[in-house]
Design a protein with these regions (language model features):
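Active-site-adjacent "lid/gating" segments in soluble enzymes
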Residues: 2-128, 132-133
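Structural detector of well-ordered beta-strand residues that form the stable sheet scaffold
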Residues: 1-2, 192
């Protein structure tokens, strides 16, 4: 079976309370995130709870099932969010030790320090994302910039990144986000508009792929990843709290009398709207 905790099953902090933010702080994942000269930026609860926690546990469970097929033996999958978050940081830790990553946040090429890997504000107060790291993408970006390209010829001149970012910010502030969408349409520069939550499901790419499903009352992401043979489907809305308690207990062999007793004493909870 699998089990997941924040701090892990052992260690001096094993029994301490904590939340996603605390786990990624201790794992070294929080400190590098944010702008230069500012405090670390909180990345929602995606890094610890979901990335370092839930996904790592699911991955571990699948690995254990595959191993059991050959060994015939089971085992416990122990997932700690601090371990998972630290694992997600492996490449950054390696870059730091190799001298390719500065300790000061917001000064590296993947944390907003570089002019070619950044989020820029547009004329209408919205934002675009740019990720023109590789030479072919950067060259395409310079073509788009036209006469301004001469100011950005030295892509990896890190000392001049701040100045180049300022100049690029001024350029992108001259058009709206939709106008930049039109400019970059069909050009491989690694570009995408920054979509707000209320916008995301309406984007043509998502609509073409069916990334989101909408039943008229609520919308949510479709199941992912996708399988070629056993396609997942949403059969209905999310269950209400305790909606299937009795059904599940019956599947485990409990009688109606036993279930009623558990509900009466508060050992389990039934539907809260009953």
């Amino acid at each position: 079976y699998g089990r997941m905790t924040g701090w892990g099953q052992d260690g001096p902090m094993a029994q301490a309370a904590g939340h996603d933010l605390n786990y990624i702080a201790l794992a070294g994942a929080l400190h590098p995130m944010g702008r230069a000269g500012e405090k670390p930026a909180i990345p929602l609860n995606l890094v610890g709870d979901f990335g370092g926690g839930g996904l790592m546990l699911a991955y571990g469970m699948v690995c254990a099932i595959l191993e059991a097929r050959s060994s015939g033996q089971g085992q416990v999958v122990d997932a700690a969010m601090i371990d998972g978050a630290a694992t997600l940081m492996a490449s950054t830790f390696a870059a730091s030790q190799a001298g390719f990553w500065r300790e000061e946040r917001g000064t590296n090429f993947l944390d907003g320090g570089a002019h070619f890997y950044e989020v820029y504000e547009t004329a209408d107060g919205k934002y675009i994302s740019l990720g023109s790291i590789e030479p072919q993408f950067y060259a395409a970006l310079l073509e788009i910039l036209g006469e301004d390209a001469e100011h950005f010829s030295k892509q990896w001149d890190m000392e001049n990144w701040p100045a180049m970012k300022d100049r690029m910010s001024a350029i992108f502030s001259t058009k709206t986000r939709d106008e930049w969408d039109a400019v970059f349409e069909g050009v491989d520069v690694c570009y995408a508009p920054v979509l707000a939550i209320d916008e995301v499901r309406h984007h043509p790419h998502h609509q073409a792929r069916g990334t989101f499903v909408d039943d008229g009352d609520y919308w949510q992401p479709a199941p992912a990843p996708r399988f070629s043979r056993t396609q997942a489907q949403l059969r209905g809305p999310s269950a209400k709290l305790g909606e299937h308690t009795e059904e599940i207990l019956r599947e485990f062999g409990f009688s109606d009398e036993q279930i009623a007793a558990k509900l009466a004493c508060g050992a389990v909870t039934g539907r809260v709207d009953q």
